[in-house]
Regions:
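Conserved mixed alpha/beta core segments that line enzyme active sites in large multi-domain catalysts
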Residues: 174-294, 299-305, 311-323, 353-375, ...
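N-terminal beta-alpha lobe that positions the nucleotide/phosphoryl donor
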Residues: 1-172, 221-225, 287-539, 626, ...
Length: 714
C-alpha cells in the first residue's frame, strides 16, 4: 500500500500530515516481516485519523483507512497470534500496533489509546513481578470492550430499529469486531492471560473450559441458581431469589436475584451494582464472545464463584466442588430501634436545620446528610426540605383500613406475622404480593388531610418560591438504608424534576408507597426483623439541570486502597446511578493521575425540562466527560471528607469510604448525596474463595521474563 499512501500524501493540504505519511510509506516499503509491517501500518493509521479533518480530502482518507485496515487484517492472519509461539514482549508490541490500528479506524478514542500505551509501557521491561504482569494484562483486557461500546454508541439505536425487520442486524457489532484489528489484539492477549494465571496457580473457568479473557469479577461471592435472561426473570411468576440472571450493562432496576452476569463492561458504581455489592451478590462481567456459551445453559441450575482477587468459576451446579457448598455464615439482620425515632414531628424541615444527629430519628440518612453537606459546603448544594417520618407514621395510624377495623400499621403487623407462618414459598410470595398491593393502594388512594395539605403547600412556597416556578426531585428516604449491613441503594423511588404543587403531592404518594413494591420488599425482607417498622421520610431537592453527573467512591473499588478515588460519570442528569455506560476513572489522590476504566458511550443523555420531567437527547460522544478542572474540584472536596460520618464508631469513622453523588453545571461542582460505601464481608470469609485466590499470594514474588514465550520457553 506504500504507493497509495504516497498518492494520498500528495493531495492533502496539511503539510505536516503529508510529510508524516510519506515517511511512513517509505518505512513500510522497506519492511517484509508481517509484525513489523503491522507496526508501521498501525502508526500510519493513527496519524491518518488525526489528520483526516485537516486533509482537505476526508472521503479519500477514509477509503485509504479501509484499505490499510484490510492490509493489517491480512498480515495478522499470517501470524500465530493465539498459538503461544510469540514471546511475551513481542505479543505486547503487536498489541500496541493493533491498538493504534483500532484507533485509526475509530474503534478507540485517543484517551483510550493513551491509557493502553501507558499500561503497555509498564510491561516494557526485561522482567517484572508476576503481580504487575497480571494486573496490567487485566487492564489491557478492557480495550476490546471499549471498542465494542464505541460501536454501540453510534449503531445501537439504528440496530434496534433495523432488527425489527431483519434480526440479523443484531449481529453487526460482533461481526464488525471480528473483522477489525481488535480481534487479533484479543487473540494475542488471551494466551498471555492464561500464562499469567498458570504462573499464579489459578484459572478462570466457564463450564469446564479454561479461558484467559472475557470474565471479570465485579463483586466477589458464591451463588447457585437457575440461569435466566433478564426477560425470563421479569416474566417469571415465582420469586427470582433463586435465579442467576444475565443482564444488559445499562440496567437500572433488578428484582432480587442470587447472582448477576453482566454483558460487556457494565457500570461498577450504578445503584444496582452497589446494592448487589452490599448484599454479597456475585456479579461477573461476561464479554460478548462468551455469551453464546452461557446461553446454552439457560434454564439449568448453575454455580458461580467470583473471588476478591478476580478469579471466576462458572459451572453446572452438579459439577460444583463439594467445598464450595460451605455456608458463608448467617445473614446479619437489621433491627430498628423505634424508641429513638421522632414520629411526632410533621412540619417540613429545611436542609439547613438538619444534620447527622437527625439520621434515623426525624428523617432518613439521605436528608440528614444533604443537611450536613448544605451546612459545610454552602453554595454547592441546591435548596432542599425534608418531609419527616412523623407525617408517614401518622398516615399509618390516623385512619382505619375498614370502619371499626385496625389501623394500617396494625393490619400490616398482623399480615407480617401470618407470612412468617407460611412454609410454602409460592403461597408466601402470593400472600406477600397481595399485602403489598393493598398498602400501595392505601397511599395512592386515601383522601388527603386538608389541613396538612395546606401547611405543606405553604412550606413549599416559603422554601422554594411560587407554585410552578421550580422543580424538585422527590426522593424516598427510609429508616432502612445506609445502615451498617444494608445500603438499599436505588431500591425506593425518586421522581425527578417535579414541577407544580399538585404534582409534588401526587409524587409524594408514589414515593411513600415505593418501599412496598415487590422489588424493594424482596431485596429488603430477608435481612430485616420487624418489617412493619419501615418508615419513609421524603427529601424534596431543588432540581439542578447538570451538564454532567455521576458517582464517586473515595477508594479504589477493586483493591480497597484509600489512595485513590473511583468515578463513574455521564453527560446530563443521573446516568451514572442509572447504570448507563459511563466514563469510569481511577484517580490517584496524591498526584491526580487519571486512569481510564471505561468511556461514556451511552448514546443519549437526560436533560430536565422547565415544565417538569425530562427528555433524552443525543449525547456528544466526546472522548472525555470530566475535565482536569472538574477533577481538581472533586479532589479538593474529598480532602475534607475524612471523619465525615459522625454516627459511626470512632475506629470505623476514620477509615470510612464515602459514596457521593455529584454533578457539574457551568463548571461548578454540585453535591446531591453522600452515604457510607458498605461492602459485604461474607465473601471475604469464604474459605473456598480464599482458596481460589491462594495462588495469587503464594506466587506474588515470581518474576516473569518477557523475552520468553507464554509457558516459560524461549
Amino acid at each position: 500500500p506504500a504507493p497509495v499512501i504516497e498518492a494520498y500524501a500528495r493531495k492533502v493540504r496539511d503539510n505536516s500530515l503529508a510529510v508524516d505519511l510519506r515517511l511512513g510509506a517509505k518505512q513500510l516499503a522497506g519492511l517484509t516481516d508481517p509484525a513489523a509491517r503491522i507496526g508501521a501500518l498501525g502508526r500510519i493509521m493513527a496519524r491518518l485519523r488525526d489528520g483526516i479533518p485537516v486533509s482537505g480530502h476526508p472521503l479519500d482518507g477514509i477509503d485509504l483507512m479501509n484499505s490499510l485496515e484490510a492490509q493489517v487484517f491480512g498480515l495478522a492472519q499470517r501470524l500465530d497470534v493465539d498459538g503461544g509461539s510469540i514471546s511475551r514482549a513481542d505479543s505486547l508490541a503487536l498489541m500496541k500496533s493493533l491498538a493504534m490500528a483500532g484507533y485509526g479506524v475509530g474503534l478507540l478514542t485517543r484517551f483510550e489509546l493513551d491509557n493502553i500505551d501507558a499500561s503497555l509501557a509498564r510491561l516494557d521491561q526485561d522482567q517484572l513481578p508476576l503481580t504487575e504482569y497480571s494486573s496490567q494484562l487485566a487492564y489491557l483486557g478492557r480495550a476490546p470492550g471499549w471498542a465494542s461500546r464505541r460501536l454501540a454508541f453510534y449503531f445501537e439505536q439504528p440496530i434496534a430499529r433495523l432488527a425489527q425487520i431483519e434480526p440479523l442486524a443484531e449481529t453487526f457489532i460482533p461481526d464488525r469486531m471480528r473483522g477489525s484489528p481488535m480481534i487479533f489484539y484479543s487473540r494475542l492477549l488471551n494466551p498471555l492471560v492464561v500464562d499469567a494465571m498458570q504462573l499464579a496457580g489459578v484459572r478462570q473457568q466457564i463450564f469446564g473450559e479454561t479461558v484467559g479473557t472475557g470474565l471479570r469479577s465485579l463483586n466477589p461471592g458464591i451463588s447457585r441458581g437457575v440461569l435466566l435472561t433478564l426477560e425470563q426473570a421479569l416474566a417469571r411468576e415465582a420469586s427470582t431469589a433463586d435465579a442467576i440472571v444475565i443482564v444488559p450493562e445499562t440496567i437500572s432496576e433488578l428484582p432480587v436475584v442470587a447472582g448477576i452476569l453482566t454483558e460487556n463492561e457494565g457500570n461498577a458504581l450504578s445503584h444496582v451494582q452497589l446494592l448487589a455489592r452490599n448484599l454479597g451478590v456475585p456479579n461477573v462481567v461476561v464479554a460478548n464472545p462468551l455469551l453464546p456459551r452461557l446461553e446454552r445453559y439457560l434454564g439449568r441450575k448453575i454455580f458461580v464463584a467470583a473471588s476478591r482477587g478476580g478469579v471466576v468459576e462458572i459451572r453446572l451446579d452438579e459439577d460444583a466442588p463439594a467445598a464450595a457448598t460451605e455456608a458463608q455464615g448467617p445473614v446479619e439482620k437489621i433491627s430498628i430501634d423505634v424508641a429513638r425515632m421522632d414520629l411526632d414531628t410533621q412540619r417540613l424541615i429545611p436542609a439547613t436545620e438538619l444534620g447527622p444527629e437527625d439520621s434515623g430519628v426525624r428523617v432518613g440518612p439521605k436528608a440528614a446528610e444533604v443537611g450536613n453537606l448544605t451546612n459545610k459546603f454552602p453554595g454547592q448544594v441546591s435548596p432542599a426540605v425534608a418531609v419527616p417520618f412523623g407525617l408517614f407514621s401518622h398516615a399509618l395510624t390516623e385512619r382505619r383500613v375498614t370502619p371499626g377495623g385496625p389501623t394500617l400499621f396494625e393490619w400490616m403487623t398482623t399480615q407480617y406475622d401470618e407470612l412468617d407462618t407460611i412454609t410454602d414459598p409460592a403461597e408466601r410470595d402470593r400472600r406477600a404480593n397481595e399485602m403489598l398491593a393493598t398498602v400501595r393502594g392505601w397511599f395512592m388512594q386515601r383522601p388527603a388531610n386538608a389541613e396538612k395539605v395546606a401547611a405543606f403547600r405553604q412550606s413549599l412556597r416559603d422554601n422554594f418560591g411560587p407554585d410552578g416556578s421550580y422543580g424538585v426531585f422527590v426522593r424516598s428516604d427510609t429508616n432502612v438504608e445506609d445502615l451498617a449491613g444494608f445500603t438499599g441503594a436505588g431500591l425506593n423511588l425518586t421522581v425527578p424534576n417535579v414541577v407544580g404543587e399538585d404534582n409534588i403531592i401526587a409524587a409524594m404518594r408514589r414515593v411513600w408507597s415505593s418501599p412496598f413494591e415487590e422489588r424493594a420488599y424482596g431485596w429488603r425482607q430477608s435481612i430485616m426483623n420487624d418489617p412493619e417498622h419501615v418508615y419513609v421520610s421524603v427529601l424534596l431537592h431543588k432540581s439542578v439541570n447538570a451538564a454532567k453527573s455521576g458517582v464517586m467512591i473515595t477508594a479504589d473499588v477493586e483493591s480497597g486502597s484509600r489512595d485513590y478515588i473511583t468515578l463513574a460519570v455521564n453527560e446530563g442528569v443521573g446516568g451514572g446511578v442509572e447504570g448507563q455506560a459511563a466514563e469510569s476513572l481511577l484517580i490517584d489522590r496524591n498526584d491526580g493521575t487519571v486512569r481510564l476504566l471505561g468511556s461514556a458511550t451511552a448514546p443519549q443523555k437526560r436533560v430536565l425540562l422547565t415544565t417538569g420531567g425530562s427528555e433524552r437527547v443525543p449525547a456528544s460522544g466526546l472522548p472525555r466527560v470530566l475535565t482536569n478542572a472538574d477533577i481538581a474540584q472533586l479532589l479538593t472536596f474529598v480532602e475534607r471528607l475524612p471523619g465525615w460520618f459522625e454516627n459511626m464508631p470512632e475506629a470505623e469513622r476514620a477509615k470510612a469510604v464515602a459514596d457521593v453523588e455529584f454533578g457539574f453545571l457551568d463548571g461548578k461542582l454540585y453535591l446531591f448525596q453522600i452515604r457510607p460505601f458498605v461492602e459485604n464481608k461474607r465473601a471475604s470469609r469464604s474459605t473456598y474463595l480464599q482458596k481460589l485466590d491462594a495462588g495469587l499470594a503464594e506466587n506474588a514474588d515470581r518474576t516473569v521474563v518477557m523475552a520468553e514465550r507464554p509457558g516459560g520457553q524461549r
